[in-house]
Curated annotation (Swiss-Prot):
Pfam name, any one: GST_C
Lineage: Eukaryota, Fungi, Dikarya, Ascomycota, Saccharomycotina
Family, as annotated: Belongs to the GST superfamily.
Biological processes per GO annotation: nitrate assimilation; regulation of nitrogen utilization
InterPro entries attached to this UniProt entry: Glutathione-S-Trfase_C-like, Glutathione-S-Trfase_C_sf, Glutathione_S-Trfase, Glutathione_S-Trfase_N, GST_C, Thioredoxin-like_sf, Ure2
Keywords: Nitrate assimilation
Protein's recorded name: Protein URE2
Domain GST N-terminal: 86-170
GO terms for MF: transcription corepressor activity
Domain of life: Eukaryota
Biased amino acid composition, Polar residues: 1-14
Gene: URE2
Limits of the GST C-terminal domain: 179-328
Purpose: Plays an important role in the cellular response to the nitrogen source. URE2 gene plays a major part in the repression of GLN1 and GDH2 genes by glutamine, and is required for the inactivation of glutamine synthetase. URE2 gene product may catalytically inactivate GLN3 in response to an increase in the intracellular concentration of glutamine.
Annotated source species: Candida maltosa (Yeast)
């Protein structure tokens, strides 16, 4: 409650009518204005010493709570007043997969960064300074202190900014490409993840755990859509695997083509495959944090989407991914 909105109770005993004239005559003697506690209370008057003490205690308690909130929120203000001269600052949340998605890319590129995990319970995402860099008041957001404190928001935009800048400064970027065709393919999968994969899992989680009342049809609808999305990824990875096996397992290629020997017999059946090219890119890594929570909506990747499961397992073993998911 704002102190300016808080009503201070007055003495309303049975003798209040009889005391009105006395109170008016002695107004200057027994009325005290509390002007040093809050600008919003300058016009509040207390007319009874006992009431004075009670109300002052209430005011002090409220002011203490407001002061505590201001101190908690002030770390955001303090940061923006004293930003680092170099490196990157990532604004995230402990339960936000999209924030960890950006952390994975920063870690993979070995870029110096610090993470500020916002406290949503205290409304830090609505701090004016933060809204200035992310008008959507959500995470993630990134500040590039190397580049005049440039701010970027939305996970996909942040990722493309990072790999494009890295390529420009270093001449190559293994998570991206200098080839326009590959760039378009990587971008397609990245946008598919940000627009179709993550939001559907997010909605399934919401209606399963956080909605105010059960809506089974919503849970079913979003969970089914997540399965459809994984079906798209599963098929793409399976095609990559088949192409890989046919290319590397030459002596058995004819048997695989004829169907007399299943692909699962190949020694390359568990070899890592990727969505674009022969290496992990941001197209692949952007899926990791959300794949890591999809079991919470009742989807078993190992059973239902074995290629997605193997693909995720390979990425989860990467040192940079491990560091990022730990919050290092």
């Amino acid at each position: 409650m704002n102190m300016s909105d808080q009503r201070i109770p007055q003495n309303t005993g049975d003798n209040s009518n009889n005391s009105n004239s006395n109170n008016n005559n002695n107004n200057n003697n027994n009325t005290h204005t509390i002007s040093n506690l809050s600008a919003g209370l300058k016009s509040v008057s207390l007319t009874d010493q006992q009431q004075n003490e009670v109300n002052l205690n209430l005011l002090q308690q409220q002011l203490h709570r407001e002061s505590s909130n201001q101190q908690q929120q002030s770390r955001i203000t303090q940061f923006f007043q004293n930003q680092p001269a170099e490196g990157y600052t990532l604004f995230s949340h402990r339960s936000a997969p999209n924030g960890f998605k950006v952390a994975i890319i920063l870690s993979e590129l070995n870029l110096p960064f610090n993470t500020i995990f916002l406290d949503f319970n205290n409304g830090e995402q609505r701090a004016p300074e933060f809204v200035t860099i992310n008008p959507n008041a959500r995470v993630p957001a990134l500040i590039d202190h190397f580049n005049e404190n440039t701010s970027i928001w939305e996970s996909g935009a942040i990722i493309l900014y990072l790999v494009s800048k890295y390529l420009k400064e270093n001449g190559e970027c293994s998570l991206w490409s200098d080839n326009l065709i590959e760039q378009s393919q990587i971008s397609s999968w990245l946008f598919f993840q940000t627009s179709g994969h993550a939001p559907m899992i997010g909605q399934a989680l919401h209606f399963r755990y956080f909605h105010s009342c059960p809506v089974p049809s919503a849970v079913e609808r979003y969970t089914d859509e997540v399965r459809r999305v994984y079906g798209v990824v599963e098929m793409a990875l399976a095609e990559r695997r088949e192409a890989l096996i046919m290319d590397l397992d030459v002596e058995n290629a004819a048997a695989y083509s004829a169907g007399t020997t299943p692909l699962s017999q190949s020694r390359y059946f568990d070899y890592p495959v990727w969505l674009v090219g022969d290496r992990a890119t941001v197209a692949d890594l952007s899926f990791v944090p959300w794949n890591n929570v999809v079991d919470r909506i009742g989807i078993n990747l190992k059973v239902e989407f074995p290629e997605v499961y193997k693909w995720t397992k390979y990425m989860m073993r990467r040192p940079a991914v491990i560091r990022a998911l730990r919050g290092d």
